[in-house]
Structures are given as C-alpha cells and as structure tokens.
Amino acid sequence: MLVVGAGGLGSPVALYLAAAGVGTIGLVDNDVVDITNLQRQLLHGTRDVGRSKLESARDRLHDVNPHVQVVLHASWLTSTNALDIVRNYDVVVDGTDNFATRYLVNDACVLLGIPNVHGSVFRFDGQASVFATSNGPCYRCLYPEPPPADMVPNCAEGGVFGVLPGLVGTIQATETLKLLLALGDTLAGRLLMIDAHSMEFRSLRISRDPACPACGTRTLTQLIDYDQFCGTPGLHTNTEARVEEINPDTLRIWIQNGSPLQLIDVREPTETALGIIAGARCIPLGTLEQQLDSLDRSLRTVLVCRSGVRSARAARQLLSAGFSPVHSLAGGMIRWQED
C-alpha cells in the first residue's frame, strides 16, 4: 500500500500498518523534518530534525517491524509521476494537506481503479472516507470544485489540534486494513466527520455523482494541471517546485551539527552591514542570477532575507535553475533575532 505524505496523517497510518505486518509500504514525500512538525508527526523525533522525512520514516518503521519493505518515493506527487507510482500498489492513503494533491490522488486512483483512503484535518475538525472503489463515489463526487486558493490554508498555516491527525490517521489505517483483508464495511459511500472540540462523530451518506468529471459520465481520461485547477500555481509544476520554509530552530540545529549547506543572505549591503548569520554568503537578490555559477547546485541551500519574502523569491529562482534542495528561512532575520 502507498502513503502519500509522511506527516501528521501518514505517521499513524504507516506505523500501524507496519505493526500489522503489511509487507510493502510505499511512502511519497520530499520534505525534511522541522521541529514544528513534532507535535503531530510521530514518525519523527528531535534527533531527526533536518533529515529527510522519508529516511526518518523508514528507520522508524523498521524499528517497529524490521521485515517490512519500505519503498521511498523522494518527490512530490505530480501529474507526471503519479500514475507510474500509484499503479504499483493495491491501496492508496491520502495523507496530504493541500487540495491540488488531493484531487491528483483521487484522479490517479480513479483512472487506475485503486481505492483511495482519504483523511483531512483542520484545527479541531477531521474527515475520513474511502473513495474510488468499484461502486462508490470518488472525492470529486463530494467536492466537484476546489475552494478559492486564498481561503483554505494548509495545516502549517491554519493550525491543527496536535492529536487530531493521530485520530484521523488511525481511522485511515483501520480502513486500509479492512480493504486489504476484505473485512467488514468500509467508509465507501460515507463521510465520517469528527469535531474534536465537542468530541462528536457524524456520518454523512454520499452517493456517486453520475455527472462527476472523474468517475461519472464525463469520465476522466488523463491527469490535468492540478495547480491551475486549484489556483495554486507552482505547487506541482515539477517535483522540486515547492519552496520549503524552515524555522530558525531547524537552521540552528543544522549549523550546530555541521550539516553540509550553503547559507545565502539576499539582503542589500546596507542591511547585511547590521549583522548576518555566521557563515552566510551575502548575495543581494538583484545580483543572484549572475552568481549562480559560483554556487553548488547539489548542496542544500538556505536563503535568508529580512522577513522571508525575498528569500522565498530567491528560492524559486534557484529551484528553476536546478538547485536542490532549497529552503527559505521563515520570518527571515526578524524571526531569527527574536528566537
């Protein structure tokens, strides 16, 4: 089975399935462990901060069950690679936190006839269901169109009650095992809604939509541009296109541990004269393009500015030029000095 996202939802799913003896678990992620992840992403610990989430997850799963085969897909799921990855598994678990990837996972599962075990969390609210079964509805039957991109933050932006991903992820693990073992009645055709604030569970019946663009009469024949569909340009234009932010604590740990990286401050000379992070190289944003050949494209790169805006812009520029991995310091020097 395949888990898309080694974060808050993917953690309990992968742990329970490894413990249950599932032979092969595929993991899709391209992020690193940040200290702010730890209150909800229990695959990872403090010693893993700065590591690849996939490597951290693999080691933790082998602690639980050394016999499980953990297949690592170190990339973001995109329209280009989704079908090639998903087709190798019997069940897909959606542990993502953005609409573009949710629609992508759904459509890939519909095209390949593979069940999609869905879960989502936001603040105190959670949802779970099973989509894309032979007779059941798919995600698009429930949500034909995505909400406006600027109205729906992800977990990092909007926040989530730390234990809620564990609750929803455990439900996803339960549904996955039931699918693999052909046991009981799954959540196919039902949406389970959880309000952790009042600790109420409700179940809503959902039906297959005959007019669904994915599984209905307007049957989907190929994957589309999901960033354009969801109004989130740049999120999945290629496997390295998303700018990853790190917080000051993570950067400090990398520096203290001597992790190989190049630290670039893209502020102007008048700004850097007031102080820089030790070891940083000062390259103003306006001259960055001319300096690209003097930088190591294969070395982890962290970009810094005053507040995080220019560094994010610089990170996108480096990603487009083939640098990987690239990170922007969240909050810039303002947050660095505050912390």
Question: What would you call each of these model-derived segments?
Answer:
Residues 1-242, 262, 268-270, 279-290, ...:
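Adenine nucleotide-associated cytosolic modules
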Residues 308:
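Conserved G/P- and acidic residue-centered "switch" motifs that form tight phosphate/ATP-binding loops
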Residues 241-257:
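A short, well-structured juxtamembrane/interface segment
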Residues 312-327:
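C-terminal structural segments of small proteins and small subunits
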Residues 274-275:
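Cytochrome P450 core scaffold surrounding the K-helix E-X-X-R motif
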Residues 304, 327-328:
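Conserved active-site loop/cleft motifs that coordinate metal ions or position small ligands
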